[in-house]
Curated annotation (Swiss-Prot):
Name of the protein in its database record: Holo-[acyl-carrier-protein] synthase
Gene: acpS
Domain of life: Bacteria
Co-factor requirement: Mg(2+)
GO molecular function, one term: holo-[acyl-carrier-protein] synthase activity
Organism per entry: Ligilactobacillus salivarius (strain UCC118) (Lactobacillus salivarius)
Primary location class: cytoplasm
Top-level EC class as recorded in UniProt: transferase
Family classification: Belongs to the P-Pant transferase superfamily. AcpS family.
Amino acid sequence: MIYGNGIDIQEIRKIQKAQEKRESFAKRILTVNELAIFEKYKGNRKYEFLAGRFSAKEAFSKAYGTGIGKKVGFQDIEILNDNQTGRPEIVKFPGDNKLQAKISISHSGEYVVTEVILEKLTWQTKMKKFLIKQK
């Protein structure tokens, strides 16, 4: 059952300017794990990554129904790529014991657009998540 849907679009250049103005910008947006990935990238790819994560966290907060603020901050949400497929996954977020998150991040030219769909977990999905963690 769908709990919420969030979509966000960002101009990569604006995120780049924010980072160039304040180096602490990325540290405010990205978790420690995300920051380690960000620091490995060079040139435009670095800013595409940062804009993608910023946009994804905004989209999540819209799907969750709170926006970014007191209830949900950028550090409360972590997005990493699956080691086998490279697909982005929201691995940490508020309500992760009751909700399942699906994410899509797309870069095109000067823009990044993201969509997050939150679904309420059924008991079957909860059991599947539990069994995967046990491996």
